[in-house]
UniProtKB/Swiss-Prot annotation:
Entry-linked Gene3D superfamilies: Rhodopsin 7-helix transmembrane proteins (1.20.1070.10)
Function in brief: Odorant receptor.
Disulfide bond positions: 97-189
Protein's organism: Mus musculus
Main localization category: membrane
Protein's UniProt name: Olfactory receptor 8G50
PANTHER family, alphabetized: OLFACTORY RECEPTOR (PTHR48018)
Gene designation per UniProt: Or8g50
GO CC annotation terms, alphabetical: membrane; plasma membrane
Membrane-crossing residue ranges in chain numbering: 29-49, 57-77, 100-120, 144-164, 205-225, 245-265, 275-292
Source organism phylogeny: Eukaryota, Metazoa, Chordata, Craniata, Vertebrata
């Protein structure tokens, strides 16, 4: 009741990545390049999989879903950040902030579980190839992807509902480059205890469960790879798995650094740097990592270019 007589915040000011004017233009150009690369890479991957009939398999169904998620949550964050680099007052309304928060959380949680689903798919393909078509049927894959999005949007709804209960009074400067949970909680003039408990609980679930699934899958995959008699075959398999595992490690490592710590000890500036990895760097790298050494993707690209040449 004490908050009813105080003026409520109707808009926030986003401080951005840095307050140094001389860095605004270089950072704008850098992140514009990253975003364009992200859009082209992920959109290109989705279109390529849709147009290539031999890529209509569970593995590429998951990969196209991952590309869609990367495209969505980088688009939720980066365009607004780019605008903020070239404007003097970086304002976002309360409603826009909560909307950005909701969709960002939804797609980040979805990515966590999508990576786990992809790791499980690779485990079945390598360790149980004879049962692959039965285990990873179209119906099973559809249910898995539906479950991934379901967990993402339900988790986001819980976080956003908790944030809507928080009262913001005078302070409205978000020390971040987008509307995220910790920076918003720092501005609250009401208790955020429930938010902190929910954040730590859901973060632990959405980071640890997929991480354990991925680790378990890769352990069995590595055991299978070690049984390959060909040295060249083992090297190719290890190099592919290591690149996949590196991308997953960067994503989950930066998420864990940001969210798996008490609110009281969270570092503001280090949090910004950590956020850059999972909001901009990983979505840009994923299309390259999952397709660079992929023979099927290269074959699909060659066929697509040959069709274009033939029609010309």
């Amino acid at each position: 009741m004490a908050y009813s007589n105080q003026s409520r915040v109707t808009e926030f000011i986003i401080s951005g990545l840095t307050n140094k004017p001389e860095l605004q233009l270089p950072l704008f150009l850098l992140f514009l390049g990253i975003y364009l690369f992200t859009v082209l890479g992920n959109l290109g991957m989705i279109i390529l999989i849709l147009l290539s009939s031999h890529l209509h398999t569970p593995m590429y169904f998951f990969l196209s879903s991952l590309s869609f998620i990367d495209l969505c949550y980088s688009t939720i964050i980066t365009p607004k950040m780019l605008v903020n680099f070239v404007t003097t007052k970086n304002v976002i309304s309360y409603q826009e902030c909560m909307t950005q928060l909701y969709f960002f959380i939804a797609f980040v949680i979805s990515e966590c579980h999508m990576l786990a689903a992809m790791a499980y798919d690779r485990y079945v393909a390598i360790c149980n190839p004879l049962l692959y078509n039965v285990t990873m049927s179209y119906q099973v894959c559809s249910w898995m992807v539906g479950g991934v999005y379901g967990m993402g949007f339900i988790g986001a709804a819980i976080h956003t509902f908790c944030m809507l209960r928080v009262v913001f009074c005078k302070d409205n400067i978000i020390n971040h480059y987008f509307c995220d949970l910790f920076p918003l909680m720092e501005l609250a003039c009401s208790s955020t205890y429930v938010n902190e408990v929910v954040l730590l609980s859901l973060s632990a679930f959405n980071i640890f469960i997929p991480t354990l699934t991925i680790l378990g899958s890769y352990i069995f995959i590595i055991i299978s790879i070690l049984r390959i008699k060909s040295t060249e075959g083992r090297f190719k398999a290890f190099s592919t798995c290591s690149s996949h595992f590196s991308a997953v490690s960067v994503f989950f490592g930066s998420l864990a650094f940001m969210y798996l710590q008490p609110f009281s000890v969270s570092s503001k500036d280090k949090g910004k740097v950590s956020s850059v990895f999972y909001t901009t760097i990983v979505p840009m790298l994923n299309p390259m990592i999952y397709s660079l050494r992929n023979r099927d993707v290269k074959l699909a690209l060659n066929k697509l270019f040959q069709k274009k040449k033939f029609h010309v």
